[in-house]
Amino acid sequence: MESSVDEEALHQLYLWVDNIPLSRPKRNLSRDFSDGVLVAELIKFYFPKMVEMHNYVPANSLQQKLSNWGHLNRKVLNKLNFSVPDDVMRKIAQCSPGVVELVLIPLRQRLEERQRRQKLGVGSLQELAPQDSSGYMDMGLPQKVRGEGAPALGEQLREGRPLASRPPGYNQALQGDPSFVLQIAEKEQELLASQETVQVLQMKVKRLEHLLQLKNVRIDDLSRRLQQAERKQR
C-alpha cells in the first residue's frame, strides 16, 4: 500500500511528535494514540490550562477509548474550533493504520496557529475557524506541505486510503529507502498475525493440559478401585 500523504508531511509530523515529551514510550503511532490520552498531552504541552489530564483514562477497551475521545472533542478540541467525526474517532480507537495521522497533521497546524496568535496578542478563536465553517473532514494540508497534486486529508479518508502503519521511533522509518516503510508495515502485520497464532496455540495447550489432568484423575480413580477389588477377592 502506498502512503497517501507525501513523505515530507509525515517526516515533519513524526519529528514534531518525537520532540514533545509524552508519558508513554513511542512505539506505534496508531496504537499509542488510540485512546486519546497522548493527544490530550500534546494539546496540554501547548496550552496547559486547556486540558485536565485526570479526565482521560489510559484504556484498552473500545468503549473507554471512545469515551476519552468524546470528552476531548467536546471539552478541548471544540475550543480550538476543531472537530473529529464519530466515524474517525472509532477508526482511531480501533487502531486503524494511518488514520490518526490525518487528525494530528491539521491539529498541529491549529495548535501552532493559535500559539502564534497568542504571542502576537491578536485574533480570537473564531478567526481560527475555516471561512466556510467546514469541519475537520474538509481540512487539508497546505499545498506547500502536501506537495503538488497531493489529495486533501478528508478526501483520502473518505476514499478509504489510510496511511501505512508506522514503526517505533516514528521518524526513524522515513530515513533511507521509502520502500523500507512498507516493509516495516508488512512485518508489523505479520508479527500481529503470529502473535494471534501463538495465543491460539497457547489456549490449545492449556486445554490439552486440562484434559490430561482429567485423564490422570480418572486413571488414579480406576487404579484405586482395582486395588480395592483385588483386596476383596483375597
From Swiss-Prot:
Expressed predominantly in the seminiferous epithelium of adult testis. Expressed in pillar cells of the organ of Corti (at protein level). Expressed in brain, kidney, lung and testis. Highly expressed in the trachea, lung and oviduct. The keyword Membrane applies. Gene3D superfamilies: Calponin-like domain. GO terms for biological process: axonemal central apparatus assembly; cell migration; cilium movement; filopodium assembly; lamellipodium assembly; microtubule bundle formation; negative regulation of microtubule depolymerization; regulation of Wnt signaling pathway, planar cell polarity pathway. It comes from the Eukaryota. Its main location: cytoplasm. PROSITE patterns: CH. Radial intercalation is a developmentally reiterated form of migration by which cells move in a direction orthogonal to the plane of the tissue from an inner layer to an outer layer. This is Sperm flagellar protein 1. The lineage of its organism: Eukaryota, Metazoa, Chordata, Craniata, Vertebrata. The gene is Spef1.
